[in-house]
């Protein structure tokens, strides 16, 4: 843990570096070159680049972003993952009952090995970008820059940054911006309440993983995209309420670095 927070200029430069690398994955790899390998390599670089950036800011490594190695933090990760998968199932049921989604032809069921490979591939390809974005939009604010946040201020700032980070969706309309902001509220609240970025990763990764598996395995399709976004926003507000209602992490179990810069 650094003895003092980094200067505003140094913190901004560190953030800008990670931001550019992260955005280049979709911008350069996905849109300009249309090359999945380049896109994947840049996303991995965005994740791995967090380590030298943290060192430059005076930290030992990924602890700068709240990615500690405590067993309870990994339990929080697993619980968040399961909770989001349940919420995604609730969204599916609500979408069907509201006429937002419909059931079509069922995709062919993969064999055991193919199915395991599909799940493993989906888990990996959603985990890396989820953690990279969580570092950028939540972990950086949570700990790395040393700001003395209050809980509501951190959650709002992180949700706004998460929404802004989707720069290629600015023209998708207000429904998408609202969906992103509500998702950001829930994910940031999890990171703050349990004093670990793994809380946010569990929810964020779970949501992305559920989407990836849904696209490949589910016969359900979204008929009203805009209504689907609003439904997702509402469900994430419910998820936010659940997070707030759950008990806080015990102070003696939270990572030591949190109290230094947080009220």
What are these regions (language model features)?
Residues 31-34, 166-174, 222-226:
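Membrane-interface helix caps and helix-loop-helix hairpins in membrane proteins
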Residues 56, 205-263:
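C-terminal membrane module of polytopic membrane proteins
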Residues 8-16, 37-41, 74-82, 119-120, ...:
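Hydrophobic alpha-helical transmembrane segments
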Residues 132-157, 189-196:
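Membrane-interface helix/loop boundary segments of multi-pass membrane proteins
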Residues 154-162, 199-211, 259-260:
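Central hydrophobic cores of alpha-helical transmembrane segments
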């Amino acid at each position: 843990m650094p003895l003092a927070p980094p200067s505003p200029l140094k913190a901004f430069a560190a953030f800008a570096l990670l931001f550019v690398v992260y955005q280049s994955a979709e911008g350069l790899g996905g849109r300009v070159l249309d090359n999945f390998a380049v896109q994947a390599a840049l996303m991995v670089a965005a994740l791995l680049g967090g380590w030298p950036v943290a060192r430059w800011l005076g930290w030992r490594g990924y602890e700068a972003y709240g990615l500690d190695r405590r067993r309870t933090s990994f339990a929080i990760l697993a619980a968040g993952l399961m909770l989001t998968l349940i919420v995604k199932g609730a969204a599916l049921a609500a979408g069907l009952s509201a006429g937002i989604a419909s059931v079509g032809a069922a995709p062919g069921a993969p064999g055991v090995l193919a199915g395991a490979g599909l799940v493993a591939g989906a888990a990996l390809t959603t985990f890396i970008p989820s953690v990279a974005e969580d570092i950028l939009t939540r972990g950086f604010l949570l700990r790395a820059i040393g700001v003395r946040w209050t809980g509501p201020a951190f959650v709002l700032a992180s949700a706004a940054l998460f929404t802004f980070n989707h720069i290629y969706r600015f023209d998708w309309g207000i429904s998408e911006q609202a969906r992103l902001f509500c998702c950001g509220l829930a994910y940031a609240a999890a990171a703050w309440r349990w004093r670990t970025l793994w809380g946010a990763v569990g929810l964020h990764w779970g949501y992305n993983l559920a989407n990836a598996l849904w696209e490949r395995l589910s016969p359900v399709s979204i008929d009203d995209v805009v209504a689907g976004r609003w439904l997702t926003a509402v469900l994430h507000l419910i998820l936010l309420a659940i997070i707030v209602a759950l008990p806080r992490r015990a102070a003696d179990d939270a990572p030591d670095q949190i109290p230094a810069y947080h009220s």
